[in-house]
């Protein structure tokens, strides 16, 4: 990451600490298994610290996102700011409900990108014309690995889309 890109108090996406809970000797292997599961599946929040005590509260079920509604709103509006804000709020709500899982963020961003492809196709714009592939791939990878990266990826996508929309005007 470049200096100044991080949110105040946030660690870069590459940092994460896993904090177990105190355990008696007989339960250490169970605690280790929990920490390994967390490392595999959970997305670090802005602090970069994942606590074993909170892991059980992370939602495992994928909640459908109203993509058709968002796509229709993007197509009829001169500004994409409202959809951007709704997506950011959706992620914040998921974070507050216990955290994010990597499988959730992967699916969320796959679906979001598919809807952006549809949005651009209806405007006769090719995705690769407006997005730099190297920058896009870097930000997409970080989006799945940290909450900070997830929010930054949404901002990146919508900044580029807003810029394209202004160029069309």
What are these regions (language model features)?
Residues 1-169:
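Cytosolic nucleotide-utilizing catalytic cores of signal-transduction proteins
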